[in-house]
A protein has these predicted regions:
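Conserved catalytic core of sirtuin-type NAD+-dependent deacylases
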Residues: 1-120
Length: 120
């Protein structure tokens, strides 16, 4: 493991065109729930699965239910960027990181200072 970590550090120090691809694992340290873990949103009981509730069609047909789910499960008051968010922002400021591509829609990358963030 130490060898792998050292290799990653070397790659980062030598690189100038890093693109970070991330997902829920980055923000779980900030208290944001994920979808697939044991405690994730997929394992909680709702009338619909999360991917249905978060669809455009569901929003059009059931706006009250959509906003209730969003408010209750996706907005985490007090969530702050964690060490990963902050380190990625620092790499961008250093000119090493070109972009963050993420499945997260929590805004924590931007709150940490990242400018080029693509939320999928």
């Amino acid at each position: 493991m130490d060898h792998q970590l050292k290799q990653l550090q070397d790659w980062i120090s030598e690189s100038r065109h890093i693109v970070f691809f991330g997902g829920a694992g980055v923000s779980t340290e900030s208290g944001i729930p994920d979808f697939r873990s044991v405690d994730g949103l997929y394992h909680q009981k709702y009338d619909y699965p999360p991917e249905t509730i978060l669809s455009h069609t569901f929003w059009e047909e059931n706006p009250e239910e959509f906003y209730r789910f969003y408010r209750d499960k996706l907005i985490v008051k007090g969530a702050k960027p964690n060490a990963a968010h902050l380190r990625l922002a620092k790499l961008e400021q250093q000119g090493k990181l070109r972009a963050v591509v993420t499945q997260n829609i929590d805004g924590l990358h931007q709150a940490a200072g990242s400018k080029t963030v693509y939320e999928l």
